Amino acid sequence: TYTASQGLLLMIPNMYKIAGEFLPCVFHVSARTLASHALCIFGDHQDVMSARQTGFAMLAEGSVQEVMDLAGVAHLATIKSRVPFMNFFDGFRTSHEIQKIEMLENDDLAPLIDQEALAEFRARALNPMKPVARGMAENPDHFFQHRESCNNYYEAVPAIVEEYMNEISKITGRKYGLFDYYGAEDAERVIIAMGSVTEAAREAIDYLVANGEKVGMVAVHLYRPFSAKHFLAAVPKTAKTIAVLDRTKEPGANGEPLYLDVKDCFYGAENAPVIVGGRYGLGSKDTTPAQILSVFENLAMPMPKNH
């Protein structure tokens, strides 16, 4: 399914049911803004962030080549994990980019399909010869317990996605992780972001590292379920200040979603870095390498500005 913006929001009630009943599927979303004070058809993450609580796993890409490589990961992982996936990339900036890429063919992906999981999925199909009842009503005595019973499935997703990323890497030669680090090994100032802004950030980081600066970036691929273990392993131990860049706005919130997730990962940690949040690129407003330089300059201040 290929959708975006208000079209995705219309699916939210069904997304709860799809995830709740463990129905494997993939929604490919060219992430776009939502109509608020005015109509805007351009790109940001307001639509996908509005659906992050539905139970769909969320996989993000920052370039056309990443979309080609990781879309297959979403399809392979949803069959094996039984968790539906929302595979998203930036509307217009990535979805409309004309770029030369290396293609993955069906023959590359077919051997990676978990045939046992696929057979089990087909066996669960509704069949009048084997009638079953699913998704029925529940009362207070059972609903809570059954709602919590999904946890094991979601805890298994990061390892499954990582497994298929490794398989895709063997085919393509391009290394992918749940969180990809780019920059100096001993970085003290680090940006956390996802989507096409990571491409601009790489340009700024190349310039700064070449000039002796200790900077870097963690690009988020698997946003939901958010694996704190994998995230913390990707962040350099030398990091002193972190800027988390969100491409969405939640009026009235203490912080945007990715910022709050990152803050939670460091909660209670000894010598935790200073973490600040920032917002960028609403409605496809350009974010340039020069603006990324400004983010790193802010992180170098004794008291970096937050939000």
Please give the residue ranges for each predicted region.
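Short acidic, glycine/serine/threonine-rich loops at helix termini
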Residues: M11-M15, S36-F42, D69-G72, H96-M103, ...
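Conformationally flexible catalytic loops at phosphate/diphosphate-handling active centers
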Residues: F85-D180
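Redox- and metal-dependent alpha/beta enzyme cores, enriched for Fe-S-associated oxidoreductases
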Residues: E185-E213, F226-A233
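Structural signature of the thiamine diphosphate
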Residues: M58-E120, S284-H307
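Peripheral docking tails and interdomain loops at the edges
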Residues: T241-H307
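A glycine-rich helix N-cap at a beta->alpha junction
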Residues: L23-A31, L109-L118, T241-A243
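Thiamine diphosphate
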Residues: T1-R52, F56-I79
